[in-house]
């Protein structure tokens, strides 16, 4: 059965944010992913986090993806990682996986993600 879609029939209740609120009040998301040549998934995931209302979004991706991320979403704080690194404090939610494959770089990112035990994580 096919029906016409009517936007007026949808009641979306988006809570109003206070005029004196700060983006840091609405959660900090870290997206880990995007190995060399597969940055699109991680870039789109970070963009989706923004559209869902996250206050601050960080993307840690392969260094070859940094320029594309910053061109598409300059509001996403993008860091190029090529070696082992530590996930910094202050993050509320971690998403690990978009754009990873079966290679050494992806395994290193995954190893860091599974050490997270004090944050909400989707791996």
Q: Would you name each region that the model predicts?
A:
Residues 1-123:
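Small-residue (G/A/S/T)-rich helix-start motifs and N-terminal tracts that mark the onset
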């Amino acid at each position: 059965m096919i029906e016409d879609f009517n936007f007026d029939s949808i009641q979306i209740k988006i809570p109003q944010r206070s005029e004196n609120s700060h983006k840091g009040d609405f959660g900090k998301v870290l997206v880990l992913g995007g190995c060399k040549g597969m940055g699109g998934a991680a870039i789109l995931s970070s963009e989706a986090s923004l559209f869902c209302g996250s206050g601050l979004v960080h993307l840690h991706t392969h260094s070859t993806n940094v320029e594309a991320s910053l061109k598409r979403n300059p509001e996403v704080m993008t860091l190029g990682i090529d070696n082992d690194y530590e996930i910094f404090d202050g993050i509320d939610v971690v998403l690990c996986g978009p754009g990873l494959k079966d290679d050494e770089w992806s395994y290193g990112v995954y190893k860091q993600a599974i050490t997270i035990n004090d944050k909400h994580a989707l791996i």
